[in-house]
């Protein structure tokens, strides 16, 4: 059971709830705090004080006063009117990630919602009633309004939701698992939707996957490195320590460890002076990507344990601020997009080197009787196409603000676009790595000298699923199979 309290949610917790379906609950301490602040907030409302989003309109309508009798209707209308997203629905694990992060931000208490709202969110997560959330509609300030509104709409029983993978009316989905539609109270509509939880939810899953992909990419590079007879001298501890970036040192250490015992490498260390950059500079490039991921993760951990609503209430005063602005997430997502894209660039160049007989000394396109057989010519095209796609996607969305809400919201982060692009970039990178595994294993079919025990274990694991290429056959299923075992950690755990 994962317990949320508004302060201590980890990326591992988010992954456990969203992907592994670990149940989640509100801590007793947070429950008491939320209930106390909510009670004080209701007293403040009763005093007649003007509070944005409680007894006023929203955005460009902030100067319109709302009567006491209309305050609850205002919240429900907000959910309905802001449910304006378009496009395909976000994956259900992403939506679950969004929901648990939103529940955690509300658990801080500053949003002044009732415990019932948080419980309703968590009940849907635990019963696996997942709102259908279109991917497009957020500009990343004020938060992720449209996507989060679709979650609220499903909570009200007026939207759509997935139950056991089946799309249906949300009221039916709720009824099937014994839940009732939620009735939003004062401020609860704006508290739910005015925040960065879509951006953060996507980022939480992407970062988890990116750590795994980097580990896989290190291993796929071993196959290419051995097949191309690289020299490990450039990975020497004293070389990388002379420029002591933490990621560079960590990757070089892995390369030394994993290549230990390779007769291929021992021979190259004696005969070669230096390699091409895509072999020699793996620690420098992968290390920089790892350092970027570490930075992004630190930003994200802060974000998922922050109050991103507006206005906020500390038990004494209500203040309109800007914690909903997604700039921290937007910049981090754009940064990671660039890093992962460039990692793919390096891998694709090694793939190209493997199939080029003039550079590799291996049979053209890694197949016997080439000419009659085209071998692995086209997987390199696929890798190039994916790299091109990632290069286009890596343009920073955060550099392109477009004012909204009659210029009341005159600078926005576009962080949702940044994270949606990042989600695709990371998936494309997984395929590029899978292609290197496929071609690297095939290249080792022509190796004469013994490879390292780690490289051998990875090669052997691949061969459990994909046989060597003796003559032309479709390769798309092999690429998909390798990506599948990558994401099950089978190649990481092979040695």
UniProtKB/Swiss-Prot annotation:
Belongs to the PAL/histidase family. The gene is hutH. Contains an active site 4-methylidene-imidazol-5-one (MIO), which is formed autocatalytically by cyclization and dehydration of residues Ala-Ser-Gly. This is Probable histidine ammonia-lyase. It catalyses: L-histidine = trans-urocanate + NH4(+). GO terms for cellular component: cytoplasm. Its main location: cytoplasm. It comes from the Archaea. Its EC number is 4.3.1.3. Keywords: Cytoplasm, Histidine metabolism, Lyase. It is an enzyme of class 4 (lyase). There is a cross-link at residues 141-143 (5-imidazolinone (Ala-Gly)). The keyword Secreted does not apply. It is found in: Cytoplasm. Pfam families: Lyase_aromatic. GO terms for molecular function: histidine ammonia-lyase activity. The modification 2,3-didehydroalanine (Ser) is found at residue 142. InterPro entries: Aromatic_Lyase (IPR001106), Fumarase/histidase_N (IPR024083), HutH (IPR005921), L-Aspartase-like (IPR008948), Phe/His_NH3-lyase_AS (IPR022313). HAMAP family: His_ammonia_lyase. Pathway: Amino-acid degradation; L-histidine degradation into L-glutamate; N-formimidoyl-L-glutamate from L-histidine: step 1/3. One of its GO terms (biological process) is L-histidine catabolic process to glutamate and formate.
């Amino acid at each position: 059971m994962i317990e949320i309290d508004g302060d201590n949610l980890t990326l591992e917790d988010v992954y456990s709830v969203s992907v592994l379906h670990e149940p989640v609950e509100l801590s007793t301490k947070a429950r008491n705090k939320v209930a106390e602040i909510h009670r004080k907030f209701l007293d403040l409302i009763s005093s007649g004080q003007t509070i944005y989003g409680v007894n006023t309109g929203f955005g460009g309508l902030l100067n319109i006063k709302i009567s006491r009798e209309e305050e609850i209707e205002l919240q429900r209308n907000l959910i309905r009117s802001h449910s304006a997203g378009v496009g395909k629905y976000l994956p259900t694990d992403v939506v679950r990630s969004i929901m648990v992060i939103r529940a955690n931000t509300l658990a801080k208490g500053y949003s002044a919602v009732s415990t019932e709202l948080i419980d309703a969110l968590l009940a849907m997560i635990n019963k696996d009633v997942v709102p259908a959330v279109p991917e497009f509609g957020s500009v990343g300030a004020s938060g992720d309004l449209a996507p989060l509104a679709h979650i609220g709409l499903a909570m009200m029983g007026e939207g759509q939701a997935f139950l056991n993978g089946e799309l249906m009316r949300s009221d039916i989905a709720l009824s099937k698992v014994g839940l009732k539609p939620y009735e939003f109270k004062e401020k609860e509509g704006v508290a739910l939707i005015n925040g960065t939880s879509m951006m953060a939810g996507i980022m939480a899953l992407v970062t988890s996957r990116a750590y795994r992909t980097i580990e896989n990419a290190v291993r796929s590079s071993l196959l290419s490195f051995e097949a191309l007879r690289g020299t490990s001298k450039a990975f020497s501890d004293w070389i990388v320590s002379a420029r002591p970036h933490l990621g560079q040192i960590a990757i070089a250490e892995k390369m030394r460890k994993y290549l230990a015992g390779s007769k291929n490498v021992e021979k190259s260390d004696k005969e070669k002076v230096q390699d091409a950059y895509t072999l020699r500079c793996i620690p420098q490039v992968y290390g920089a990507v790892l350092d970027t991921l570490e930075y992004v993760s630190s930003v994200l951990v802060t974000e998922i344990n922050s109050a991103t609503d507006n206005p906020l209430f500390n038990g004494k005063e209500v203040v309109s601020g800007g914690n909903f602005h997604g700039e921290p997430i937007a910049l981090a997502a754009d940064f990671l997009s660039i890093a992962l894209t460039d990692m793919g660039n390096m891998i694709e160049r090694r793939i190209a080197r493997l199939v080029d007989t003039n550079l590799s000394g291996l049979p053209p396109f890694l197949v016997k009787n080439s000419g009659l057989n085209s071998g692995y010519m086209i997987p390199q095209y696929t890798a190039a196409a994916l790299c091109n796609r990632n290069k286009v996607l890596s343009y920073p969305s955060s550099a392109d603000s477009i004012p909204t809400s009659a210029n009341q919201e005159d600078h926005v982060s576009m962080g949702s676009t940044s994270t949606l692009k990042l989600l695709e970039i990371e998936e494309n990178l997984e395929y590029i790595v899978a292609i290197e595994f496929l071609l690297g294993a095939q290249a080792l079919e022509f190796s004469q000298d013994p490879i390292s025990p780690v490289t051998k274990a990875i090669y052997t694991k691949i061969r459990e699923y994909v046989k060597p290429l003796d003559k032309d056959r479709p390769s798309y299923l092999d690429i998909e199979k390798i990506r599948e075992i990558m994401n099950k950690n089978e190649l990481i755990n092979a040695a």
